[in-house]
Amino acid sequence: MASTIERKTLEANEEPVDEVLQMPPSLLTCGGCQQSIGDRFFLKAIEQYWHEDCLSCDLCGCRLGEVGRRLYYKLGRKLCRRDYLRLFGQDGLCASCEKRIRAFEMTMRVRDKVYHLECFKCAACQKHFCVGDRYLLINSDIVCEQDIFEWTKLNGSIV
């Protein structure tokens, strides 16, 4: 389950009081190092407060408090997206090369077919597709707009 990370800031002109617990921040304890939090910036995740450097993935150690990062919490472990998918994601097979797609790999999906990024290319001319390119899915083969006529002539009907 993905969790949100709340970033808290204490402004110099504000009373240093936590909004939720009504406690002075110096009485807050970090969920990681168990030390008092006296920093101006701190995080709240998994119902605990954290120093920015203490909230990290339990497996790879990457910082989870950075902007754009997601925190996944499962079976008592704090995980980054990559490690969460590696442990709990589902693997599958590429519709083109039929090799394993690991759960953390980037993929392209067309209907019920899944492809490695490097396999998502025209079956006729081998050109990789860009955003906005038009193509046709014929069985598990992807054919670019320019090659559709030639492909169907050589390989039979579209349907």
UniProtKB/Swiss-Prot annotation:
Signal peptide: none annotated. It comes from the Eukaryota. The keyword DNA repair does not apply. During embryogenesis, expressed in hematopoietic and endothelial precursors, including the two stripes of posterior and anterior lateral plate mesoderm at the 1-somite stage that give rise to the primitive blood. The keyword Repeat applies. Induction: By ets transcription factors including ets1. SUPFAM superfamilies: Glucocorticoid receptor-like (DNA-binding domain) (SSF57716). One of its GO terms (biological process) is positive regulation of transcription by RNA polymerase II. PANTHER family: LD11652P, RHOMBOTIN-2. This is Rhombotin-2. The gene is lmo2.
